[in-house]
Amino acid sequence: MLYILIIILLIGLDQLSKIWVLNNLVDVSTIPIINNVFHLTYVENRGAAFGLLQNNQWIFIIVALLATVFGLYYLNTRKVHIFGRLGIILIISGALGNLIDRVRLGFVVDYFDFRIIWEYVFNIADVFVVVGTVFLCIYVLFFESKSR
């Protein structure tokens, strides 16, 4: 059950970063960390990645809840290699972090703005989901059949 504590800590990190953004970036919009390369930029994201499915909050809420339930079920009923376990933990943490925003605020708070390579702004929860997906793919491709 250590994974529950890790999920709670990761969600806490995500929410603390978003509270900081809401308290410090709303009025200034953006703070250049490395000018024209990396900024902290306040964005209210009402859709998914790349601006898809704007204003369809219920879809994201249902998907986040299903991912969480399935992930927790899988962790509790299967022997899972560390890559799979970390992947599931990160995906659940990211999904719930953004879910909290959607329910509490009606949008997701995004703030990482790597202007030099990417036009989209994202947050720590998004990083959790992407890295978790990579770990889950590694698990499925290389370890899943061995852990059965």
From Swiss-Prot:
It is an enzyme of class 3 (hydrolase). Its EC number is 3.4.23.36. It is a multi-pass membrane protein. The active site is at residues 110, 126. Pathway: Protein modification; lipoprotein biosynthesis (signal peptide cleavage). InterPro entries: Peptidase_A8 (IPR001872). Keywords: Aspartyl protease, Cell membrane, Hydrolase, Membrane, Protease, Transmembrane, Transmembrane helix. GO terms for cellular component: plasma membrane. Its main location: membrane. GO terms for biological process: proteolysis. It comes from the Bacteria. It catalyses: Release of signal peptides from bacterial membrane prolipoproteins. Hydrolyzes -Xaa-Yaa-Zaa-|-(S,diacylglyceryl)Cys-, in which Xaa is hydrophobic (preferably Leu), and Yaa (Ala or Ser) and Zaa (Gly or Ala) have small, neutral side chains. It is found in: Cell membrane. The chain crosses the membrane at residues 57-77, 80-100, 124-144. GO terms for molecular function: aspartic-type endopeptidase activity. HAMAP family: LspA (MF_00161). NCBIfam families: lspA, PRK14768.1. Belongs to the peptidase A8 family. This protein specifically catalyzes the removal of signal peptides from prolipoproteins. This is Lipoprotein signal peptidase. It comes from Clostridioides difficile (strain 630).
